[in-house]
Amino acid sequence: MRPLNVQIRLGNLRHNYQILKEMHGGKLLAVVKADAYGHGAVRCAFALADLADGFAVATIDEGIRLRESGITHPIVLLEGVFEASEYEAVEQYSLWPAVGNQWQLEALLIRHWKKPVKVWLKMDSGMHRTGFFPHDYASAYAALKQSEYVDSIVKFSHFSCADEPESGMTEIQMEAFDLGTEGLEGEESLANSAAILNVPEARRDWGRAGLALYGISPFGGSDDRLKPVMRLSTRIFGERVLQPHSPIGYGATFYTSKSTRVGLIACGYADGYPRRAPSNSPVAVDGKLTRVIGRVSMDMMTIELDASQEGLGHEVELWGDTVNINTVAEAAGTIPYELMCNIKRAKFTYIE
């Protein structure tokens, strides 16, 4: 069997949730969209079932999957519905929809709901993707407030640069949000992972923990308070010694500078490892750091082995404990979200 393995450490997931919840101080949604950032939404949700105040997803299908698996917690649809007919499923599965534009608002208001719905009303405080502009927010809020079909309203917005504290955008967005919601009663939600960790003023009634929930610092590098949940590993299944000035891999982009032990490992870009990862991207053999050499192929990669490192059959960590996923992502010119969400053709093992 091909030895590409993903370990999901559910104990680390629980640890991270508890740390973030304590820091936030209010209620905390565990964001499990995109199959929990590639970790497995159902397994992660059940691991957090006795801790979480609720969950957040991106699509109706993601919410339904949690409900049909037995999750009874609040589930927020962060993007709301994509067509008016989906409000039927919102009601059937007791989901909490975000409302971020006029047609979503109007479709919700003209529907005859059998039971009142809890709405998350989104403001565009400066990111300019979705949400009502601050000067339009109060009127959208009033329309919902007057409806007999609306149980309650959570006011929320999303930060564009919370992971870039020096930008000043988070403060600008908070000011816009506070001005646009002035005098409007109800709960609020502003803090994503970066704001939970770094912006106390954004910790309102509800937090939304995404990247940090999975043990990854949104600021790059590592955060000793968090424990990585995903560990991606494989094994060496081939080994050879190349003479100096030998090319390796497609495009002959890497040449050995000396006699070099080369390990062949079972992982490639078809498995989700980034093809853009350059030579010198870190990996670890039995806990000792080494590097990728040559281009990443579809199904395999080549790594450098020094004289002290074991070879054939030994484990190689691609990211997890010794190798920080932020380091891999930075080397490849991408972000850790993309790496985790892209993993496939691997055996998943869940560790309680």
Swiss-Prot record:
Pathway terms, separated by semicolons: Amino-acid biosynthesis; D-alanine biosynthesis; D-alanine from L-alanine: step 1/1
Binding of substrate, residues: R129, M298
Modification type N6-(pyridoxal phosphate)lysine: residues: K33
Lineage top rank: taxon: Bacteria
UniProt organism field: Neisseria meningitidis serogroup C / serotype 2a (strain ATCC 700532 / DSM 15464 / FAM18)
Alphabetized UniProt keyword annotations: Isomerase, Pyridoxal phosphate
Active site (catalytic residues): K33, Y250
Family indicated by similarity: Belongs to the alanine racemase family.
GO molecular function, one term: pyridoxal phosphate binding
Cofactor: pyridoxal 5'-phosphate
EC number: 5.1.1.1
The protein, known as: Alanine racemase
